[in-house]
């Protein structure tokens, strides 16, 4: 759990779908450009879960740019309470998901130290400097923290 009503994971397998059903999800935010598999689309339809897809190509090269406009749009979707409870995922739940969650943490006014600690906890030995630079440079828009987007009592982590 990232925050109440906001979850993260790697790509859910078929065996994970039963657990996902227990979360009462309204939305799944998929951060990859590939088509969602038919088996999963059937599950989403059966459960009334909407698929929000923001296709971010994996950034394995050190100088590949993360598309800020796409991540901003994805962040707006995460912050929209009508989409919650929401699951954010990419293929591994490390890099693309980590960047989006890192941007959310900036909206929540977490310190960079805490944001990077969380990012590295999920990315492990595969942490990417380019992702951390993206998070560091990201400036939340005034609209991102609009009233009602997240509960008023946001924890500020040191």
List where the protein language model places each region.
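Cys-dependent protein tyrosine phosphatase-like superfamily
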Residues: 1-88, 92, 99-158
